[in-house]
Amino acid sequence: MGCLSCVNSCTHQAIEFEKDVCGFRYPIIDQEKCVDCGLCGFVCPVNHPPEKYFPKECYAVTVKSERELFSCASGGAATAIARHVLNTGGVVYGCSGMDIRHVRHVRISRMEELDLLKGSKYVQSDLGLTFKQIRGDLKVGKEVLFVGTPCQVGGLKTYLRKDYDNLITADLVCHGVPSQQLLNDNIDHYRKKGVDLQEDSIRFRTKMSSQTQSFKIEFGWFFLKNQPYSDSPSKKAYYRDPYMFGFIQGLFFRRSEE
C-alpha cells in the first residue's frame, strides 16, 4: 500500500523502502537490525481488512461560499472540516501538491496555509514520518484532522493501535494511484516535446465557467506556459494525455490496488 505504517512503527530503523521499475516503493527489512518483534506486520493495514457496513445516513455537502467552492476540486467538504479544526486550535494533515515533483503530506496549523492542501492530486503522496507527528499531537491533546486515501487512513489507525477522541479522519473515494515517478516522467515528456510549462500550475481536475451553471468540473492535464501574460491554462483532454489516460483506465496502479 505504501502507507509507511511499518516504517513509522519500527523502533530499530530496520525497514527501508525501495522503488520498483515503475517507481512504487516497497518495504525491505534489514535482517541485521530486525529483532523479529512482529510489530510491522501487526500495524500493516493489509492484515486488518476493514469491516464492511452500510452507513445509516449519507449527506451531500458543499461549502456555502461560492468563491471557496470554486477554489476546491469538488464540493469543499474537506476544506470546511479543516477550517473548523483550525479555528478551534487544532492541526490538519493533508496532501500538498505545491511541489508537483514531490507530492507529500504536510502539517498545517494556520488558516493561511489551507491553500497548500486544496485540489486533487492523482498520484501517491509521500507520508514520510507523518504518523509519528500525528501521534505526538494527539498525545498532547491537540485536535487532529487527517485527510488521505482509504489506505492511508487505514494505515494511520493500525499504527496508532487505539482510538483517540481528538482524531478526525477523512478519506476519499479512490480507485488507485500512480507513482510519483510516472508523474515526473509525464512532465519530462512534455518538456522533451518543447512545452515550457509552469510545474506549479499543473492541475488534474479543474472548474471552468459554464453558460448553463456557475461552473463545471473538467478532468485532464491543465497547465500554464512560461510565457508573458500566460494566464489562461492550456489543457489536454484526459484521453489525449498519457498520464491521465493511464490513470482513468487503471493501467499503472500499485500491485496491491489491482
Labelled PLM ranges:
Residues 32-33:
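Short, charged amphipathic alpha-helical surface segments
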Residues 51-257:
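Iron-sulfur-associated redox domains of electron-transfer enzymes in respiratory
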Residues 1, 5-28, 39-55:
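Iron-sulfur cluster-binding cysteine motifs and their immediate structural context
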